[in-house]
């Protein structure tokens, strides 16, 4: 997976820099690029498209097919990206390009994705407390993604790109077991 990220990062950075530069003229440019990349990413993930990517040797035919499928979803710059990536045989990394692009956008907008895994459904008050605490700790706006894992027994695990806070009962039991083994 890290190889895909390494390949995708320069494309994502170039698209992001271009989108930010163009956003001086049109404020919605970054969002438009996010939508184009998301659409391309979903298209490329499709099984039939994956088969077509591996079976077609002509990069021009490949690019033209992808562009014709996307028709209204891509502007001229999006089409140029498809042509460039097809020419370099990199269309299969578009999902990774989209993920990297999202990371650049989040950094640009001072956003952080925070995943909360809890033993039970969190109510709105609990979610707001976590958001407030994480915004204070990270000094940026937080987007909270919650999911339930009953194997935690109680408590929650909070994850960002930089760190993990394990406040789950399962985590405490595991730490206690490790201490008792010493």
Swiss-Prot record:
Topology relative to the membrane: Peripheral membrane protein
Subcellular location: Cell inner membrane
Gene3D superfamilies linked to this entry: N-terminal domain of the delta subunit of the F1F0-ATP synthase
GO cellular component: plasma membrane; proton-transporting ATP synthase complex
GO molecular function, one term: proton-transporting ATP synthase activity, rotational mechanism
UniProt keywords, alphabetically: ATP synthesis, Cell inner membrane, Cell membrane, CF(1), Hydrogen ion transport, Ion transport, Membrane, Transport
Major location (coarse): membrane
Keyword Ion transport: yes
Annotated InterPro entries: ATP_synth_OSCP/delta_N_sf, ATPase_OSCP/d_CS, ATPase_OSCP/dsu
Disulfide bonds: none
Subunit structure of this chain's protein: F-type ATPases have 2 components, F(1) - the catalytic core - and F(0) - the membrane proton channel. F(1) has five subunits: alpha(3), beta(3), gamma(1), delta(1), epsilon(1). F(0) has three main subunits: a(1), b(2) and c(10-14). The alpha and beta chains form an alternating ring which encloses part of the gamma chain. F(1) is attached to F(0) by a central stalk formed by the gamma and epsilon chains, while a peripheral stalk is formed by the delta and b chains.
The name this protein goes by in its record: ATP synthase subunit delta
């Amino acid at each position: 997976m890290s190889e895909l990220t390494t390949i995708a990062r320069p494309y994502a950075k170039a698209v992001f820099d271009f989108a930010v530069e163009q956003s001086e003229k049109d404020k919605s440019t970054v969002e438009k690029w996010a939508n184009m990349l998301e659409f391309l990413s979903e298209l490329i993930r499709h099984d039939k498209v994956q088969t077509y990517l591996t079976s077609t040797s002509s990069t021009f035919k490949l690019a033209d097919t992808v562009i014709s499928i996307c028709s209204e979803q891509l502007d001229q710059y999006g089409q140029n990206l498809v042509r460039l990536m097809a020419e370099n045989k990199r269309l299969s990394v578009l999902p990774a390009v989209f993920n990297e692009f999202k990371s650049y956008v989040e950094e640009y907008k001072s956003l952080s994705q925070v995943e909360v895994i809890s033993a039970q459904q969190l109510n709105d008050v609990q979610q707001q407390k976590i958001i407030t605490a994480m915004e204070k700790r990270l000094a940026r706006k937080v987007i909270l993604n919650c999911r339930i894992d009953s194997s935690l027994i109680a408590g929650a695990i909070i994850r960002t790109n930089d760190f993990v806070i394990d406040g789950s009962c399962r985590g405490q039991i595991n730490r206690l077991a490790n201490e008792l083994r010493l």
